[in-house]
């Protein structure tokens, strides 16, 4: 019973970490990355689909993203979505869109670091909330000795610390990436 609660808590924490990683991938660091545009949703034949489903996204140069669109009808919606969501102006060349990323200003880097810290704190709070819920479930179990509960709570804390550390490490490396001058 206790093991099930701990496994469920750890599984939820892994999901939180994966969500945090996907949020980090969207941070613009001055270096081009396919993750910056591939999940942007566009209106395409009446439904909303990510760019990666209507074209091939690549990074030919460190400050450029290239989108080779498979269907001519998707080019305008992609251009519009990129302008709205990233405030970048893609250059059209036939069925290809080229996005050149301007270098980040020092001010923008500071804003990104603030946003990173906020996102990091939200991820840590999510992990702590999972720990709190699991702790309450463990403490409410009937017919379990105090020692077993104590051992389970210690194990839960170790799991929590591991994932909090992982979030901190991911955040630190992303912050270095943002503040690094190119």
From Swiss-Prot:
CDD domains: RRF (cd00520). GO terms for biological process: translational termination. InterPro entries: Ribosome_recyc_fac, Ribosome_recyc_fac_dom, RRF_sf. It is found in: Cytoplasm. It holds the Pfam family RRF. Keywords: Cytoplasm, Protein biosynthesis. GO terms for cellular component: cytoplasm. One of its GO terms (molecular function) is ribosomal large subunit binding. It comes from the Bacteria. Belongs to the RRF family. PANTHER family: MITOCHONDRIAL RIBOSOME RECYCLING FACTOR PSEUDO 1, RIBOSOME RECYCLING FACTOR. This is Ribosome-recycling factor. It comes from Hydrogenobaculum sp. (strain Y04AAS1). The lineage of its organism: Bacteria, Pseudomonadati, Aquificota, Aquificia, Aquificales.
